[in-house]
Amino acid sequence: MFRLPIVKFFNRIFNRVTITVVLVALQVLWLLWAFWSFTAGRVWLNGALKALSILIVLYLVRKDENSAYKICWIVLIGLLPLLGGALYLAFGNKAPAKHLRERMQKVEQAHQTELAQPEGQTDALDISSRNLSRYVAKFGPYPAWRDTAAHYFSCGEEMYPQLLADLDKAEKFIFLEFFILRSGKMWDGVEQILRRKAAQGVDVRLIYDDFGSLLGLPSDFVIRMERAHIRCIPFNPVVPLVSLVMNHRDHRKIVVVDGNVAYTGGVNLADEYINAEQRFGYWKDAAIRLEGAAVWNFTVMFLNVWNAFRPQETDYTAFAPTRLPAVQDGVVQPYADSPLDEEPLAETVYLDILSQAQRYVYIYTPYLAVGCLLYTSPSPR
């Protein structure tokens, strides 16, 4: 009679999160012990490490880098002059792991032609907007589109019923890419439709961030999805090793249905995003539904990540939009940013919006983490 509670207790204690945290903590303690043991009594080594720290601080001062990032490292090195320089050499590189970077770059380079900017799409824009659009098309590279309808949802519970309705209408494919998946009302509603559509022969694919979803999904989640013919990729799986590579996460929220409808915004597939559960009080995050030509950008974004890990398509045209909306809402240009290059695309877009604003700028986000450049932006006051 005590067997089931005991099993549940052990499952809670010895889960992926607990094991990962314990193993990483043990590694950190061992590395610290090894470092201090190796340097104890070795005056020449202590001097060399301090000199290394000084050189790295000078390097950071001169480096063209985000000021907040540099200051954090300089303060850490100042507090730990022996260890700080070595830590920077080990963990200071913000670039993704080599294998991840090479995979992504290979796929993106192979499909750059899929994102060529069609002529005439931005002719109606003013000069400043056209210049910004050209910048995004060049460095994204993501083109701008007319023939697109856009609908704004001010919170997740407004978006959710429409999302379910669009998923239920899928005939060819459904692509989903999210940072957080968590079992509950929201995900259960989506999963039921995905399972039914997959059984009907619809191509259903799911990418989720393994770290973001670590606490919310069962350990056999991928197996369950694959058995239901829902192909699944956990992005950058969490491993119990001390590594900055684990910091590179997939924060995107994308849904594409038949190439004609797309969703994006800040809403993940977890109950707090539709306020079915209030973990942090009322949660207010926005979402956008697009229908028409601009959906193509989201389709390519998804397929590039998918083919980096499960190479499949060499030709994306089978996933192109087939239906244009009756009502159009100006020019729409979805874009993505990543650490694969040194171009701060998203930050530059926000800086341009702030600098060009004449009357007001509305910023709506649950997470306000403003960098130095945004604080000092020369926008009109």
Residue ranges and their predicted role:
Residues Y375-R381:
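Conserved small/polar residues in nucleotide/adenosyl-binding loops
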Residues Y364-L368:
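NAD(P)-dependent dehydrogenases' Rossmann-like dinucleotide-binding region
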Residues M1-D352, Q356, R381:
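N-terminal localization/anchoring segments of enzymes in phospholipid and broader phosphate metabolism
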Residues V370-L374:
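Binding-cleft/active-site segments that stabilize strongly anionic ligands or cofactors
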